[in-house]
Amino acid sequence: MSGGREIALLGGSFNPPHVAHLMAAWWALATQGVSEVWLLPTFRHPFGKDLAPFEDRLEMCRLAARALRGVHVCGAEAELAADPLVGKTARTLEHLAAKHPDQRFALIVGADILAETAKWYRWDRVQALARIIVVGRQGHPPVPGAPDLPAISSTEIRARLARGEDVRGLVPEKVLRYVEEKGLYRG
């Protein structure tokens, strides 16, 4: 990769996207010298978890991204749907580097995820293709210079939605409306 702008990728299942995702994106834009943050929903979860349909998660990311200037959505993993390595960060980064040769990439990961990189496919390749930006997570060792994100979990949000509980304040309002209109995560 050459000079160009640096784009930070915030990958995840976004099942659904929540305000801590937006906080991480804003923090990266404000403090890490990146020109943009791309929300990058996984097409298929690398560890086999069930997800809402990709198209719904992509649209929820678009709705969430509208809240912050400089945050966009990248559906690159859909382009790799037939690839047996879809969902593997190294493969996605290789794809993006080939598609955008004038861009530099960074990868935003939570401290909780950083502890699991031994399970990742070709973590060494991920580090070669992208600068790693670590955000703190409550309940994990502090990350120097990074705030701890609130302990908001998509899993807990889905459970609350399934029980008919209120999740306002945890999920962007437009995302919540979409979830309700589509009947996602009902019990």
Swiss-Prot record:
Domain of life: Bacteria
Keywords: ATP-binding, NAD, Nucleotide-binding, Nucleotidyltransferase, Pyridine nucleotide biosynthesis, Transferase
EC number: 2.7.7.18
This protein's record includes keyword Transferase: yes
GO MF annotations in UniProt: ATP binding; nicotinate-nucleotide adenylyltransferase activity
Gene Ontology BP terms: NAD biosynthetic process
Reaction catalysis annotation: nicotinate beta-D-ribonucleotide + ATP + H(+) = deamido-NAD(+) + diphosphate
Pathway(s) where this gene product acts: Cofactor biosynthesis; NAD(+) biosynthesis; deamido-NAD(+) from nicotinate D-ribonucleotide: step 1/1
Matches recorded under Pfam families: CTP_transf_like
CDD domains: NMNAT
Record InterPro entries: Cyt_trans-like, NadD/NMNAT, Rossmann-like_a/b/a_fold
Role: Catalyzes the reversible adenylation of nicotinate mononucleotide (NaMN) to nicotinic acid adenine dinucleotide (NaAD).
PANTHER family listed in its UniProt record: NICOTINATE-NUCLEOTIDE ADENYLYLTRANSFERASE-RELATED (PTHR39321), PHOSPHOPANTETHEINE ADENYLYLTRANSFERASE (PTHR39321:SF3)
Sequence similarity: Belongs to the NadD family.
Protein name: Probable nicotinate-nucleotide adenylyltransferase
Native source species: Anaeromyxobacter dehalogenans (strain 2CP-1 / ATCC BAA-258)
